[in-house]
């Protein structure tokens, strides 16, 4: 049964605060990262350490950060990146993230194996089955893991295939994630490197999202 928007709204004070194991102020995303987890978050890990995960790792209500980019609220984040990387200008970095964050799905709710997508006052949902993971090696030499899920309901208008990437390689509650969505195949999504809509916990204010991004 689909998660209803009103249910998500009512639950904001209880459900989504606990679901991502996210405590703002102390930047606590559950238990502290181990050395292996910290290296994995930076794209360095042994393939043998990658483990399967369940959809419950992404349980919660999540907001797209694309509107924050469009409003200019993420400019301090891009400026920090430009200051740290002298090979790219602020404008180049912002353009890169503009392409990456672009999406019309404003909110995502995840509960009991069901993912609900909210777009322009329209809602689609489906129960997703786990389809394994894929380890990717990027041009930079760093690696990442995508966790694959499939909607097998032919009547659903939700994306047939979705993939999560959150810099985590083993079971752990997510604090933010990139998601890849489509109807062609998992492989076509694995080839997508330029558009990775990004979501943070819904209860965070824009200032808190910026603070989170600046701390990483």
Curated annotation (Swiss-Prot):
Binding residues for Zn(2+) 2: 176, 212, 216
GO aspect biological process, one term: intracellular zinc ion homeostasis
Keyword annotations: Cadmium, Cytoplasm, Metal-binding, Nickel, Periplasm, Signal, Zinc
One GO CC term on file: cytosol
Signal peptide: 1-23
Subcellular location as annotated: Cytoplasm; Periplasm
Annotated knockout phenotype: Mutant shows a growth defect and a lowered cellular Zn(2+) level under Zn(2+) limitation. Mutant does not bind cadmium.
Sample GO molecular function, one term: cadmium ion binding
Residues reported to bind Zn(2+) 1: 167, 176, 178
Domain of life: Bacteria
Up-regulation conditions: Repressed by Zur. Up-regulated in response to extreme Zn(2+) deprivation. Also induced by cadmium and hydrogen peroxide.
Function, in words: May function as a periplasmic zinc chaperone or mediate direct transport of zinc from the periplasm to the cytoplasm under zinc-limited conditions. Binds zinc with high affinity, and can also bind cadmium, mercury or nickel. Preferentially binds Zn(2+) over Cd(2+). Contains one high affinity metal binding site, and can bind additional metal ions at other sites.
Family: Belongs to the calycin superfamily. ZinT family.
Protein name: Metal-binding protein ZinT
Species this chain originates from: Escherichia coli (strain K12)
Lineage of origin: Bacteria, Pseudomonadati, Pseudomonadota, Gammaproteobacteria, Enterobacterales
């Amino acid at each position: 049964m689909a998660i209803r928007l009103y249910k998500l709204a009512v639950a904001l004070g209880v459900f989504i605060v606990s679901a991502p194991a996210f405590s703002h102020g102390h930047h606590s995303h559950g238990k502290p990262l181990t050395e292996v987890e910290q290296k994995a978050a930076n794209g360095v890990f042994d393939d043998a350490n990658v483990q399967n995960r369940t959809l419950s790792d992404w349980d919660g209500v999540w907001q797209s950060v694309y509107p924050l980019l469009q409003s200019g609220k993420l400019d301090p984040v891009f400026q920090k990146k430009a200051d740290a990387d002298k090979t790219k200008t602020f404008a180049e970095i912002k353009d890169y993230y503009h392409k990456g964050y672009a999406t019309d799905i404003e909110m995502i709710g995840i509960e009991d194996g069901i993912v609900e997508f909210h777009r322009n006052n329209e809602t689609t949902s489906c129960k997703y089955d786990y389809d394994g993971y894929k380890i990717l090696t990027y041009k930079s030499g760093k690696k990442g893991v995508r966790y694959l899920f499939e909607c097998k309901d032919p009547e659903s208008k939700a994306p047939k295939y979705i993939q999560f990437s959150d810099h985590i390689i083993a079971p752990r509650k997510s604090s933010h994630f990139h998601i890849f969505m489509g109807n062609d195949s998992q492989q076509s999504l694995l080839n997508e490197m330029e558009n990775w809509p990004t979501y943070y916990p819904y209860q965070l204010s824009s200032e808190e999202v910026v603070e989170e991004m600046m701390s990483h």
